[in-house]
A protein has these predicted regions:
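A detector for small-residue-rich transmembrane helices and their helix-helix packing motifs
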Residues: 3-215
């Protein structure tokens, strides 16, 4: 009986360990984006009209919720796929390194800051447009990952500073090749993600967060 109890207990620990390895936040955020995209195939006109972001919606109507809702809308399958691949696989590393609470703060803060810089760009140029997509938040994860790589003596999860820099430059370059890409949101997300990662890695334990050890 004792042997059976020990085997069950050990099996429970192994299951918990396996569950802890799953990047739940990245997985859930990816799933939500996919579900919303599928919903847009049926209710796209309503969702895009009510969820896309532009500074005009903030100034005229005070619809600040659009800073967040626009992050979960995508124009087409390639737009969604590009963002979700980076969100899941890049986010997985960040989430496992800094924890779920910090990860969520980093993700949403970067997305919001990306949209805010986009708003500043609209005001400064007088060119107003509606924008959608999670790329501001995704670039925030890339910026956060860049900080983690630098903070860990130039390498984290087999990713070097050189590889990170090349990935960022290629991503930004491809964005500037298209007039449809919101590069202001990309830059805003990237910079805020880097800064947020620095700040989040130097604060104490957050509410709802288990004790952890930073390597």
């Amino acid at each position: 009986q004792d042997g059976g109890y020990m085997r069950i207990q050990q099996s429970g620990w192994e299951m918990k360990r396996d569950l802890d390895r799953i990047p739940w936040c990245s997985a859930i955020l990816t799933a939500v984006n996919v579900i919303v995209f599928l919903a847009c195939q049926f209710y796209g006109n309503v969702l895009y009209a009510q969820g896309s972001f532009s500074i005009l919606y903030l100034i005229r109507n005070g619809e600040y919720y659009r800073l967040v809702t626009a992050m979960f809308l995508h124009a087409d399958i390639s737009h969604l796929a590009n963002n979700m691949i980076l969100l899941y696989f890049g986010g997985e590393i960040v989430e496992k390194t800094i924890g779920k609470v910090r990860y969520l703060i980093l993700f949403f803060l970067s997305g919001i800051c990306g949209n805010l810089l986009s708003a500043v760009y609209e005001l400064s140029t007088g060119s107003f447009y509606e924008s959608i997509g999670a790329s501001g938040a995704v670039f925030g994860l890339i910026g956060g990952l860049l900080y983690l790589v630098i903070a860990r003596k130039g390498r984290a999860a087999s990713i070097s500073v050189q590889r990170m820099a090349l990935m960022i430059l290629l991503s930004l370059y491809s964005g500037f090749q298209s007039v449809r890409v919101n590069n202001a949101a990309h830059l805003g997300g990237l910079l805020s993600g880097f800064l947020a990662a620095f700040l989040l890695c130097h604060v104490g334990r957050l509410p709802g967060e288990r004790a952890r050890r930073m390597e």
